[in-house]
Amino acid sequence: MANLSSDFQTFTMDDPIRQLAELSNTLHHFQTFPPPFSSSLDSLFFHNQFPDHFPGKSLENNFHQGIFFPSNIQNNEESSSQFDTKKRKSLMEAVSTSENSVSDQTLSTSSAQVSINGNISTKNNSSRRGKRSKNREEEKEREVVHVRARRGQATDSHSIAERVRRGKINERLKCLQDIVPGCYKTMGMATMLDEIINYVQSLQNQVEFLSMKLTAASSYYDFNSETDAVESMQKAKAREAVEMGQGRDGSSVFHSSSWTL
């Protein structure tokens, strides 16, 4: 019994050391394997089945319970990533809803401002147009432009007045053509006016010459009339003197008159 107990103790002491060595070898081998390595670890650990009465079995169970395998880590990471994605989605939805609400508010305010600005701009434009139309009407009333109207196009009042004025000018020019010698219808306006000016100047010269002659004739007539008046006055005085002498000496005058007979 003593030998069995000593052998059992040595077996029990040697088994954990062997198990630790095997675990170190398997871990070293696990580090050399490429991922995925969950199935290889499971195969390594579960193919080596130990009896239940070994004390290392509890250690193996503890090791399986305490160590997190990569499959568990992957599951945890996937769950955490899913949770993060859900959180992100919820945050993005909240941000998008807030942005949409803010954008709607800004659009409503901007549309209201645009409508107000549009009304103000339309009012300003209408007032400006009214002012411009009034200014244009005033300018049209002030400006009087005489435009030469063609035949059949006398529609404006100014063009009608211009047409009437030109008709009167043409009538007067026809009268001058009949009066002034050397003026013909085939002549131009400039040559016709030159002929009329020359004719008027010649008439002025003739009038001046005739006026000089009239002044000379009138002066001569005045001198002759003065001499005739002096002579008539002298004759009248001589007759009066003769008559006075006869009244004083009537007999002598009678004798002289008788002798003369």
UniProtKB/Swiss-Prot annotation:
Segments of skewed composition (Polar residues) = 95-123
Query: Which portions of the sequence form the region Disordered?
Result: 72-158, 242-261
What coarse category fits the chief subcellular location reported for this protein? nucleus
Q: Which GO terms describe its molecular function?
A: DNA binding; DNA-binding transcription factor activity; protein dimerization activity
Q: How would you summarize where this protein is expressed among tissues?
A: Expressed in stems.
What is reported when this gene is inactivated? No visible phenotype. Redundant with BEE1 and BEE2.
Q: Per the entry, what induces it?
A: Induced by brassinosteroid, auxin and ethylene, and repressed by abscisic acid. Insensitive to gibberellic acid.
Swiss-Prot/TrEMBL keywords:
DNA-binding, Nucleus, Transcription, Transcription regulation
Its Gene Ontology biological processes? DNA-templated transcription; regulation of DNA-templated transcription
Which InterPro entries does this UniProt record tie to the protein?
A: bHLH_dom, bHLH_ZIP_TF, HLH_DNA-bd_sf
From start to end residue, where is composition biased (Low complexity)? 72-82
**Residue ranges under compositional bias (Basic and acidic residues)?**
135-146
| Cellular compartments annotated | Nucleus
Domain of life of the organism in this record? Eukaryota
One GO CC term on file = nucleus
Report the residue ranges that make up the bHLH domain in this protein: 153-203
- Known function: Positive regulator of brassinosteroid signaling.
**PANTHER family in the record, alphabetically?**
STEROL REGULATORY ELEMENT-BINDING PROTEIN, TRANSCRIPTION FACTOR BEE 3
Quaternary structure (record): Homodimer.
Q: What is this protein called?
A: Transcription factor BEE 3
